[in-house]
Amino acid sequence: MKWEGIVFTFLLIYSSSFGCIFFLTPLIPFVYFQPRLGRWLMDQMIWLWQLYAVFLYEKICGVKAVISGDAVYDDECELIIMNHRTRFDWLFVFSYQIRCGSLRHFKISLKEILKNVPGPGWAMQCAGYLFLHRNWEHDKSTISKCFMYFKKLNYKPQILLFPEGTDLTAWTKAKSDKFAKANGVEPYEYVLHPRTRGFKYFVEQMRDVNLFDSIIDVTVGYPINIPQNESDILKGNFPKEVHFFIKRHKALDIPSSEENVDMWCQKVWKEKEERLKKFYQDKKFHVKDNKIKLKDESEIQSLFKFANIFWSIFQISTFILLIYAPIIRWFALLSIGIFVFISKFGGIQVLLDSELESAKHYM
């Protein structure tokens, strides 16, 4: 077990938990009474924490992001689809998003169980992430409400979706191979067969509310070290590099019929399989015409420094105040109680209906 893994895990959990308690709890009323302002304030605080998370794993743990492929735009409404190699793809993709997309407007589709994780899960609720039950009727309603919410607030989300539904392990690969055999299709080695029903519905809903500029197809690869789960991170088994290959597809180029969207997704995943096969042979993506445009790295490094200073001061101050200031302890307990109560009744997401009604006044 390396010290980097312990320090990274502690600081990530400490900052997200107490940041949620002291910064996000006071913003919850704005979600109801001032939806646009509430969303903006929440996004600023989540963005500041995401910067800190990237600083920790890039600067403390030595992870390097390598990005290539098509140019993308940070002011577009995007559906980002990516292969799910490890349980930490969603975290490492921050490195791509901060350099190419909009980290403030970045949302993730995650498993429902994650929203109830004390601290980090509560922060994810406030971030506006989509939590899906794998109950189709329930999930359809959740997805529809989320896009109506973004539409009412004139908000341009960039949403990460993992069509495979889970990360690549020996067990999930066996299930994917079984599916392939049953359906007479080729088994994959480097990706899982995508579950296209959710993907098709995302595309449909984004079109319906006119929040659909492009699909960003991200292929992620780990040439050295693949941290599969939380224990790998705790042990300090971080990837030396995370490679992202980007293909941008204009919304107008995506088929309109549900059947053709299904076939399009299957085709994209077959291309991913072939691309990753070559990647793991050569330890890099081969790019004929690299059009990617990265943001100024010096500005990003300045943001990292700011985030590090901000969260370091906050964490030290919080530690001292929790010891010596009873009112701070009572506020922390009150905040925890609020999040436990809200989570028990569906989480921040249940406020979406109220937000939709309130947001009508801003249209």
Region locations from a protein language model:
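Catalytic lobes of large eukaryotic enzymes
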Residues: K145, A180-I309, I348-M363
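Membrane-anchoring hydrophobic helices of lipid-metabolizing enzymes
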Residues: M1-E78, T86, L91-F92
